[in-house]
UniProtKB/Swiss-Prot annotation:
Note: Present with 1920 molecules/cell in log phase SD medium.
UniProt cofactor(s): FAD
Species annotation: Saccharomyces cerevisiae (strain ATCC 204508 / S288c) (Baker's yeast)
Function: The outer membrane form may mediate the reduction of outer membrane cytochrome b5. The soluble inter-membrane space form may transfer electrons from external NADH to cytochrome c, thereby mediating an antimycin-insensitive, energy-coupled oxidation of external NADH by yeast mitochondria. Involved in the reduction of D-erythroascorbyl free radicals. May play a minor role in complementing the function of CBR1 as a DPH3 reductase in the first step of diphthamide biosynthesis and tRNA Wobble base mcm5s 2U (5-methoxycarbonylmethyl-2-thiouridine) formation.
Keyword tRNA processing: no
Transmembrane segments: 12-32
InterPro entries the record matches: CBR-like, Cbr1-like_FAD-bd_dom, FAD-bd_FR_type, Flavoprot_Pyr_Nucl_cyt_Rdtase, FNR_nucleotide-bd, OxRdtase_FAD/NAD-bd, Riboflavin_synthase-like_b-brl
A Pfam family the protein falls into: FAD_binding_6
Protein name per its UniProtKB record: NADH-cytochrome b5 reductase 2
Length: 302
């Protein structure tokens, strides 16, 4: 599955007893750190799953692409951790001049055990209330957050492999899932990411994704899809959408030990899986994945 993909598709991980105890404890930590890192730093958790909003200042704003920025938020202390677990997110809120609350979910792209700060990658949408507000902020301005919001309870080695299908900022929860899986030496799950964008310049988190692929070639693979490579002669990906034929050839089938995770804008979701009905209702599986024979229980929509 992780071999180089054909260009033909460019179209369509006493003393003896002490040693054993240490080894066992180490294995337990690595096997569980993705879901339960908060167990080891309970007092340092900022977000505890209650209804309390916490105002956090922006420490840095960086350009990620022509319409996307990376916001770094400072946690209360240098030893503070978010308190999130794998496949979870945060609510962000601001209050309009008329007193209305605008609330949106965001998935941090930082390591879950990162101390002192966390990062969000946010795309500006024309007419989007939250994104317009965020893009009008500057360092030291604050945003209110609460959480975590649980999305999916990941269990290491539950599947032999998983496939992540994403487009645009849909990469955020997929990247959080991918990099914590492949960096856990006790989780042997193979991760295959299919990521679509308009142009190579629109690919978000590309540096991080390429670094994962280089460091963990046996556990992680990413294929980029673009509508137009423009003048990027070094682009090494597919100049097409993520086709049904490509998925059928390069993704484990419905009868294998696999699971698929999908995240992207509404048209993308409708094409591959259908949208969720609500945060707690995945809705029916439609689109390309349904046509390929995958069941509703094999696909999760972020």
């Amino acid at each position: 599955m992780f071999s180089r993909l054909s260009r033909s598709h460019s179209k369509a991980l006493p003393i003896a007893l002490g040693t054993v105890a240490i080894a066992a404890a180490t294995a337990f930590y690595f096997a569980n750190r993705n879901q339960h890192s908060f167990v080891f730093n309970e007092s340092n958790k900022v977000f505890k799953g209650d209804d309390k909003w916490i105002d956090l200042p922006i420490s840095k704003i960086e350009e990620e692409s022509h319409d996307t920025r990376r916001f770094t938020f400072k946690l209360p202390t240098e030893d503070s951790e978010m308190g999130l677990v794998l496949a979870s997110a945060l609510f962000a809120k601001f209050v309009t001049p008329k007193g209305s609350n605008v609330v949106r979910p965001y998935t941090p792209v930082s390591d879950l055990s990162q101390k002192g700060h966390f990062q969000l990658v946010v795309k500006h949408y024309e007419g989007g209330k939250m994104t317009s507000h965020l893009f009008g902020l500057k360092p030291n301005d604050t945003v209110s957050f609460k959480g975590p919001i649980m999305k999916w309870k990941w269990q290491p080695n539950q599947f032999k492999s998983i496939t992540l299908l994403g487009a645009g900022t849909g990469i955020n929860p997929l990247y959080q899932l991918a990099h914590h899986i492949v960096e856990n030496p006790n989780d042997k799950t193979k991760v295959n990411l299919l990521y679509g964008n308009k142009t190579p310049q629109d690919i978000l988190l590309r540096k991080e994704l390429d670094a994962l692929k280089e460091k963990y070639p046996d556990k992680f693979n990413v294929t980029y899809f673009v509508d137009d490579k423009q003048d990027d002669q070094d682009f090494d990906g597919e100049i097409s959408f993520i086709s049904k034929d490509f998925i059928q050839e390069h993704v484990p089938g419905p009868k294998e030990s696999t699971h698929l995770f999908v995240c992207g804008p509404p048209p993308f979701m409708n094409a591959y899986s259908g949208e969720k009905k609500s945060p707690k209702d995945q809705g029916e599986l439609i689109g390309i994945l349904n046509n390929l024979g995958y069941s509703k229980d094999q696909v999760f929509k972020f």
